[in-house]
């Protein structure tokens, strides 16, 4: 009988501790930590977008170097010169957007890291913390949407730069020889 009473009291104490637990559950902490790792993909995407913009810029610089003195002929051709200026401006704009979005993503990820680091000290319940975490996820989702849109613009611009390079090479590359 004594064993039954001790077991019952022990079980009641454990139940009371769990029921009165303050702070997030271990499952919530694990869920948030796993989701945070998923959010880090956005940082990689932002870096890739910035690198793609830089590679487009380099493509135009390489074209200019490849043509050498014949580049002057491109500059004198009103249509090609205007197209080059437009492409250069678009690349600079998208490069700026990539850097801005990258900064936004880094700021959100820093906030997510601070949230995760502070979870163990929190006294709030899962439901309250889930609202805060949801706001962080929403910011990352917004940035991911911007990154997707930027990726589409960069892909389109990549095609335009390729077409421009083909046109210029077709017109002026033979004259270099």
Predicted segments, located by residue:
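Generic alpha-helix initiation/capping and coil-helix boundary signal
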Residues: 3-5, 9, 39, 43-46, ...
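Intrinsically disordered and other compositionally biased segments
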Residues: 11, 18, 61-62, 68, ...
């Amino acid at each position: 009988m004594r064993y039954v009473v001790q077991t019952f009291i022990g079980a009641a104490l454990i139940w009371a501790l769990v029921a009165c637990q303050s702070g997030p559950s271990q499952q919530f902490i694990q869920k948030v930590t796993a989701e945070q790792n998923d959010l880090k993909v956005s940082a990689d995407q932002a870096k890739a977008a910035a690198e793609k913009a830089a590679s487009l810029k380099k493509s135009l610089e390489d074209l200019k170097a490849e043509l050498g003195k014949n580049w002057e002929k491109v500059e004198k051709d009103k249509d090609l010169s205007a197209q080059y200026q437009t492409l250069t401006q678009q690349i600079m704009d998208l490069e700026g957007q990539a850097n801005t979005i990258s900064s936004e993503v880094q700021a959100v990820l820093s906030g997510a890291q601070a949230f995760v680091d502070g979870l163990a000290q929190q006294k709030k319940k899962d439901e309250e913390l889930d609202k805060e975490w949801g706001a962080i996820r929403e910011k990352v989702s917004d940035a991911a949407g911007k990154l997707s849109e930027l990726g589409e613009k960069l892909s389109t611009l990549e095609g335009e730069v390729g077409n421009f390079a083909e046109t210029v090479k077709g017109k002026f590359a033979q004259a270099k020889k």
